[in-house]
Amino acid sequence: MLAIAILAAGKGTRMQSTLPKVLQELSGLTLLERVLTSCKDLTPDRSLIIVGHESNKVKESVNHISGLEFVNQQPQRGTGHAVQQLIPVLKGFKGDLLVLNGDVPLLKAKTINDLINKHRSSKANVSILSARLSNPSGYGRVFSNEHGHIEKIIEDRDCTKLEAKNNLTNAGIYCFDWESLSKILPYISNKNNQNELYLTDTIQKLPLAVHLEIEDAGEVSGINDKRQLAKCEQLLQERLQDFWMEQGVTFINPSSCTISEQCEFGKDVTIEPETHLRGKCIIANNCHLGPNCFISNAVIGKNSSIIYSVVKNAQIGDNVKVGPFANIRPDTMIQNNCKIGNFVEIKKSYISEDSKINHLSYIGDSEIGKDVNIGAGTITANYDGTNKHKTIIGAHSKTGANSVLIAPIVIGENVTIGAGSAISKDVSDNSLAIARSKQSIKDNWSKKLKGT
């Protein structure tokens, strides 16, 4: 049997935030959600989260995940004290206890499995993850014998100068035999510089303690402040981008771009500098994104390009060109072979194939037919101050520059709207609609003004 306990009670004072530390976000997910994700495939018998500071907020943040149990730690007196709170909760439990930190979000599922497997194959009372760090400051040091059995772990603040030179560190990830641990947990001491109960003090009291040294120390990077949060974001982005580059995606300047774990890319996609993808983005083959794009929860068809633009919660077809400086807002669908040009905003609209909206337009709550040409400066006036109204434009129609279509309105097929028109009534197929004042010219007007 397996129980998982996640330590999530701390305040995170160094974060300088109103949120508990485990609710800080890393690439769209909280630190706690990331830890839970890393162990979701273990199918544990018990999943326990030890909460304390702002416990209600922490509970609410994961209420969409079933099967979680919460254990309160008040006050917070160290990792050993946190795990002591499990003694009544796990009474009668026979099996292994995996202890994870809520502020170590980059741990891979494979690494956790490897630790559990080593723990069980070695029949140890406790197994820990260890890592060699070039700068081990802040981490407890692991001291083991020639057989790889741990003799002791000394917290950084309690190390002598000689002990501090050891760069084999405790990653803070443990797998215990619960029966062995529960017998000694009540007896750990707070005789240390922090007057806290350290979980590491149980190591020397257990008959057999082993460690698994991991190759990628970045996996066990802990987060205590915003600098470390930014560093973990960088590590996560490197991990994601390395994976997709192996699948054929080109990043021109990877360090300037960010993507989410939900993103999916086809072959021969190119991502230019300063391009950021959030949420679930599906990008088909041969797309060219950027530079300077923000794309969120979007589907982009093959051979499409987006430059200097924002796309949110929208679908874009094949062979579509967007930008520069376009804003594609939610619930927009742009079909194949369309062109959306500079300073165009589209919201909650359907743009049929082969249509062009090239310059300086606002299209909202609209249905645009096939092969429509929207002239520069055309807008759909969709809001009457209370409600939004729909504009429908039939296939093969075109609007002249600086036109206003006052919704609700239906423009038929093969219609031409004269430049500068404000159209407020439906227009039938094959018509020309003009709604503007007659031009008046006053000869010699300038001379009269000057009195000559």
Swiss-Prot record:
HAMAP family: GlmU. It catalyses: alpha-D-glucosamine 1-phosphate + acetyl-CoA = N-acetyl-alpha-D-glucosamine 1-phosphate + CoA + H(+); N-acetyl-alpha-D-glucosamine 1-phosphate + UTP + H(+) = UDP-N-acetyl-alpha-D-glucosamine + diphosphate. It is found in: Cytoplasm. Residues 227-247 are annotated as: Linker. It comes from Prochlorococcus marinus (strain SARG / CCMP1375 / SS120). The gene is glmU. Acetyl-CoA binds at residues 376, 382-383, 419, 436. The keyword Protein transport does not apply. This is Bifunctional protein GlmU.
